[in-house]
Amino acid sequence: MTEKENSPWVEKYRPTSFKDIVLDPTNKEIMETILKKNYFPNLLLYGPPGTGKTTTIINLVNSFQEKHGQKNQGLMIHLNASDERGIDIIRNQINQFVNSQTLFKKGTKFVVLDEVDYMTKNAQQALKYLLRGIDGNVRFCLICNYITRIDESLQNEFMRLRFNQLPEKDIIN
């Protein structure tokens, strides 16, 4: 059996292209506008577990990179903040990635932070200060289930998009 055949159902059928993702009309329009324009804002996706936040952002970043000739895994870092919740993840991994020079790699860097609602308040503050000190070549995409656990001043640095459970008819079709 192949690796895909042994994968859990959710992984086996996870969309691998942005065009295959089912979203509510408002979020779909916003995401399509991001792809059409040459501007990718810092995004904060929030909502209940299992609503497609992570799949959407990974596919959106990949589609954006492809459209702009920047498809390179070295330009994106994807971290789960529930694994490393403290300030060290900001000081070490993220800061190092953001400030590293990319030889032979041109394009926008993307930092995707999943489960940000599990980060400590100090780590959230450090992230806010890092955001304010970077150039326009880096975009942050935060994902969380509970937006109330995210410092409001950090929220204000992002375009916020709420993800809700889709009606079953939308998922099946």
Question: What is each of the regions a protein language model found here?
Answer:
Residues M1-R160, N164-D170:
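P-loop/Walker A NTP-binding region and its immediately flanking N-terminal helices
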